[in-house]
Amino acid sequence: MRRPFMTSPAQLESLEGQQYLVLRPTRAVSDVYRAEQKSALGRMDAPHPHTEHVTLRAFHEPKRREELLALIREWAVAQRPIEVVAEAVDVFPAPWQVVILRLRRTPSLVSAYANLSEALEGTDLRRLDERSTEDWTFHLSVIYAKTLAPAAWTELSHKSRRSLSSRPAETISEAELVWYEDGAEHSEVIPFGLRSFR
């Protein structure tokens, strides 16, 4: 059984009705992520993902999930494996206040995001916090520190940010569509380069 991405009741409640297309690192990037998250949680107790993930898109389409799944499956058929490379521990500043593991903009990662943007053009699927390919920061959220006071956030931000000399990397050959419904997380694994016969 796969580890869920979110587990706390408060997180599950806040995500109700939403869907996320994500990548799940499982090797080198996962290892450095877990070490960084453990270190961050040692400095403060804060909401955080239960499992590392790279979000490619967020949606709010609880009544059109099958339509959304069909579009993503079609996108995945033409998708090649994606190289993810961790390059730094960084932050999203206030008002978000999130410590992140920032990823390099590898050609395969940028292409996957851009191709998804193209697939979504002309649809009225509701996207959340969508950015252009140029403006999107590829990342894994480590902890969510939105409730920290400004001084405490400034200190955490300064202590967290650093470049990674080792540049851990791995290749991911599938995506997951994750959705939140009735207080629970659900997901479907979608391999790249394979046509589903559903």
Regions found by a protein language model. Give the residues of each.
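Short histidine-centered catalytic/ligand-binding loop motif
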Residues: 99-105
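A broad, low-specificity signal marking well-ordered, structured residues that form hydrophobic/aromatic
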Residues: 82-84, 98-99, 138, 170, ...
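Glycine-rich beta-strand-turn "strand-cap" elements at beta-sheet edges
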Residues: 89-95, 170-186, 194
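A short small-residue
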Residues: 53, 95-97
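Hydrophobic beta-strand residues in large extracellular and virion-surface proteins
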Residues: 21, 101, 175-177
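Pocket-edge structural micro-motifs
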Residues: 58, 102, 179
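Basic, often amphipathic N-terminal segments
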Residues: 1-85, 106-166, 184-198
